[in-house]
């Protein structure tokens, strides 16, 4: 997970880490997603029920194409919080098979103004 910091640069943020994004600035991320499971992940266009999305605070970011086991994609310029933050705010990233289940690890970052 990389988040654009207050200086406008991409900053790698580890699970449980923090980043200063600037007060009121949109929180924008670049997410590298790897399928470590047994089955291929399908995009919503191929599987409206069960297609895979990354979720963050109620927002959903669908994967753009099929990801085979051990495959990887990068979701560029994902706006996690359009209105930014005014105080330290945790953001939890998860995976969801649309309409079926939330799965995989929880990845949490704290965004500060």
Kindly give the residue locations of the regions a language model identified:
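Short beta-strand and strand-turn-strand segments in soluble, beta-rich domains
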Residues: 10-12, 50-64
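Terminal connector regions
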Residues: 82-111
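Short, solvent-exposed beta-strand/turn "edge" segments of beta-rich domains on protein surfaces
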Residues: 17-26, 67-69
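Intrinsically disordered, low-complexity Pro/Gly/Ser/Thr-rich segments with frequent PxxP/GP/PP motifs
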Residues: 58-84
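Asparagine-centered strand-capping/turn motif at beta-strand->loop junctions
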Residues: 33-37
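Low-complexity, acidic Ser/Thr/Pro/Gly-rich terminal tails and inter-domain linkers that flank the onset
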Residues: 1-22
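Short, hydrophobic/aromatic beta-strand segments
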Residues: 38-54
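Short, solvent-exposed loop/turn segments enriched in Ser/Thr/Gly
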Residues: 13, 23-30, 74, 87-91
């Amino acid at each position: 997970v990389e988040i654009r910091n207050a200086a406008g640069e991409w900053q790698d943020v580890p699970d449980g880490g923090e980043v200063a994004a600037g007060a009121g600035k949109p929180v924008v991320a670049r997410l590298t997603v790897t399928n470590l499971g047994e089955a291929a992940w399908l995009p919503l266009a191929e599987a409206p029920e069960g297609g895979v999305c990354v979720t963050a605070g109620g927002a959903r970011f669908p994967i753009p194409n099929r990801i085979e086991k051990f495959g990887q994609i990068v979701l560029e310029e994902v706006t996690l919080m359009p209105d930014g933050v005014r105080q330290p705010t945790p953001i939890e990233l998860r995976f969801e098979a649309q309409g079926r289940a939330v799965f995989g690890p929880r990845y949490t970052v704290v965004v500060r103004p």
